[in-house]
Regions:
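Cytosolic regulatory regions of ion transport systems
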Residues: 1-77
């Protein structure tokens, strides 16, 4: 399954790692470059550094092809 996760906090990171281990195609959008770089080493998937509400960032993560979209940020604006 092609999954996009916005937010690599505790829950988003855990889900990304577990879903990647189960061989799902995982893309994570994270605004914090350091957190994104750490996650990139932990999953077999794509990490996009950027704003999850930006059309350009969503396009870079291939949102049009995703089957499941999980918004797991603490910022709802």
């Amino acid at each position: 399954m092609n999954i996009i996760i916005v937010g690599a906090g505790e829950i988003g990171r855990h889900l990304a790692i577990e879903l990647s281990r189960k061989k799902h195609q995982v893309s994570v959008i994270e605004s914090d470059a350091k957190r994104g770089a750490e996650l990139e080493r932990e999953i077999e998937g794509k990490v996009v550094i950027g704003d999850g509400s930006s059309v350009n960032t969503l396009s870079e993560a291939n949102v049009g092809e995703c089957e499941l979209f999980l918004a797991l940020t603490s910022d709802n604006t």
